[in-house]
Amino acid sequence: KAEALKKLHFDEIKKLIDESPRTGSSMPILGMQNLNAEVVEYIQKNHKRIAVEKIEPSFAKDLKLKYPDDARAVIDYQAINHILKEHKNLSFEDIANYRELSKQANETLKLKDNQNRPLVASFKQINGFFVVVEQVSNAKNELMLKTMYKARGDYRDSLIYKRTLAKSQNSN
C-alpha cells in the first residue's frame, strides 16, 4: 500500500519543501504525520506547495486522474491564504488535518467545479459543528486542497450541503 514515511523534524520538513519540484511525479511525499500547523504556516508564508500523500488508486480513477497509481493530494499556499481569509474560524491546525477530515467524512460528494474540473466535497460532523473540505483534481495528476468551511449545526441541514448535493446529482 502506501510507503511508510518517517516523522521528520521541522528543519528536515522545510528542506524537503524548499527543494521539492513544484509539480510532477518527482515531487516528494511529505506524509500526513509531517503536516502540522507549523508546516502549514511555513507553506503559506513561503509561497510553497507540497504533496501530502498518495491518493488511493481506485479513488484517483473515479476522479479520472491520468495516472491513478501515482496521484497525489497536494496543498499549496493559495488554498491556505483563501481559507484563512474567507473562513476566519479555521486555523493552521484545522488545515493541517484536512486529509484526515476528508477521509473520515460522514459523506463525500463528487461534482464539477465552475471550471468543469472534478471536485470532491467531504462533510465531517464533529459534535455541534461540521467541517467541509473541498478538493479539486487538476491536469497535473493532483487532488488539490481548494477550500474548507466550518459551521455550527448538522451538515445535512446546511445550505452548502443542499447546494453541493444538488450539483453532484446533476453532474452524474
Q: What positions do the PLM features span?
A:
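Ribonuclease/tRNase effector modules and their secretory precursors
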Residues: K1-N172
